[in-house]
A protein has these predicted regions:
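ATP-dependent adenylation/nucleotidyltransferase module used to activate substrates
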Residues: 1-117, 224-226
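ATP/NTP-dependent adenylation/nucleotidyl-transfer catalytic domains that generate, transfer
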Residues: 121-123, 127-226
Length: 226
């Protein structure tokens, strides 16, 4: 069966991802986007679970109108628990694309047994000292806030660049949620990675519970001096 193995470069996967693919799986075609993730944030703001424009632009666009084999599994999350081995995409933008999921019933244990049995190379981030359970976009909004914080703390330079991108968006879009409710990029980023309602955030800020030095708070958390 002829197939084309593709990696969509989201520009925000963990460092070393592309060299790893080139060294170990040279047959994989690396597709680069027209806009990077940071450029998208600077133009559209932070993504969210309900507003995943980053997935549409950076991950799914290559599969429009095609039959795609993907590695998603039911036991990865509650959202994927109802996935079928094959399902067609009803979104107009995907133009009838079909998603074939050959591993949909596999467990995590079966995945690792297969990897070790066949001695398949995999990224170092699954092993100590990282111990990641997933390899994907750093700070993905589909992950928990706790996972987002862990990933940004592991890769602090990504976080700093994201602060700069949202700052640019806020300056050019002052009428939006991020532009209206936050004073600077560090403040917006702090809210983005924490489990706080906007009401609670504003109350805590008014009460000076944050001491309102979000740049210092973010940098201290990330362990950097800037």
């Amino acid at each position: 069966m002829k197939f084309e193995a593709v990696y969509s470069n989201t520009t925000i996967d963990p460092p070393g991802t592309i060299p790893f693919i080139r060294d170990n799986y040279p047959e994989v075609k690396i597709v680069n986007p027209k806009e990077s993730f940071l450029q998208l944030v600077a133009r559209k703001g932070f993504p969210s679970r309900q507003r995943r424009f980053c997935c549409e632009v950076l991950k799914e666009s290559y599969g429009v109108g095609k039959r795609n084999l993907e590695g998603m599994r039911r036991d990865e999350s509650n959202n994927r628990a109802g996935y079928e081995p094959e399902q067609c995409d009803s979104r107009k933008s995907m133009k009838g694309a079909c998603h074939v999921l050959p591993l949909v019933f596999w467990t995590e244990r079966q995945i690792w047994e297969y990897i070790h049995k066949h001695n398949l190379p995999y990224m170092k981030y699954y092993d100590p000292p990282y111990n990641f359970t997933r390899h994907g976009c750093v700070g993905c909004p589909l992950a928990t806030k706790q996972q987002m914080r862990i990933e940004f703390k592991t890769f602090p330079r990504y976080a700093i660049n994201l602060v700069k991108a949202i700052k640019k968006f806020m300056e050019t879009h002052p009428e939006t949620f991020w532009g209206k409710n936050f004073d600077n990029g560090h403040e917006a980023f702090y809210y983005y990675i924490n489990d706080l309602s906007l009401q609670d955030f504003k109350f805590m800020k008014t009460a000076s519970m944050f001491k309102n030095d979000f740049r210092r708070m973010v940098n201290n958390y990330l362990g950097i001096n800037e």
